Amino acid sequence: MNFSSIFSQLKDPHRLIFICAALLCLTPFMSSPMALVLGFTLASLGWVPKDWNIAALTKKLLSYSIIGLGFGINLTAAIEASSHNLGLIIGSIIFTLILGFIVTRALKFDPITGHLIASGTAICGGSAIAAVAPAVNAKADQTATALACVFVLNSVALFLFPALGHLLNMSQYDFGVWSAIAIHDTSSVVGAASAYGDEALKTATTIKLARALWIIPIALVSALIFGGDKRKLNLPYFIGFYCLAIAIAHWLPQFQPLYNTLFMVSKHTLVLCLFLIGAGITVQKMRASGPKPLLLGVILWMAIGVTSLAYILYFQ
């Protein structure tokens, strides 16, 4: 793209407002919930550039941001947090998938769409849906419905969870565990956790990505159950690089100032990610999902949210 085409694009006031809003999200003045609302507002007004692939940009930026967060994670603490909560991670996944099957049958809802919503709730939202969809031969509308449902609930979680955490006077660690278990997408997990505090963010990111590793066995089992193609699995590569970033920071501690900078920059780019996610949500998309998938999503979300919270507060 040459300079003349860039300047011609900036003559469009809506495009210029969108770019300025995106840049504002990289400043300390913009919080994660504010960024999401700002993106949603611009999308509702029709001010999102239609020739930009927002979804692809969000996916790449989110991956790079999560890798950057890895440089701020202590390896020993990460192993301890993941191993200490392994039972909760596995139990929550199995519980959500079984409950999803039961509720889908009770609602007489499409089994493939129901399984996608349950997988997204059980593991890591849109990434899990994207990985499981080809494994179960899901159609485009089934995948879109599941994604729309998860995105709506993610948006609510970004505001609801920090408020509930403060209301319940949860510690940074406990809130990090709870958000990692009960919020769908990694982006909303880190958004809610970063709003609560840095320690909550580090705990939540570590446990969420440990949970995300279960995409692989769940996608394989889903392919066997639904007769899909195991060769079409779409697995998020950034998890491995996130683990590598943690290892590098542990093995080469002499570069700690650089790691601190990467961690802080990644926190700001995550806010930008939430702005872009908001820019991809419209009222039309929310209405298109209909009542049944949203009802299923809410039931599963409330079940995993309440049970995991009770476990963390009273049994951990």
Curated annotation (Swiss-Prot):
The keyword Transmembrane helix applies. GO terms for cellular component: plasma membrane. InterPro entries: UPF0324_pro (IPR018383). It is found in: Cell membrane. The keyword Transmembrane helix applies. It is a multi-pass membrane protein. Keywords: Cell membrane, Membrane, Transmembrane, Transmembrane helix. Pfam families: Cons_hypoth698. Its main location: membrane. The chain crosses the membrane at residues 61-80, 85-107, 114-136, 146-168, 175-197, 207-226, 233-252, 262-281, 293-315. It comes from the Bacteria. Belongs to the UPF0324 family. This is UPF0324 membrane protein SO_4708.
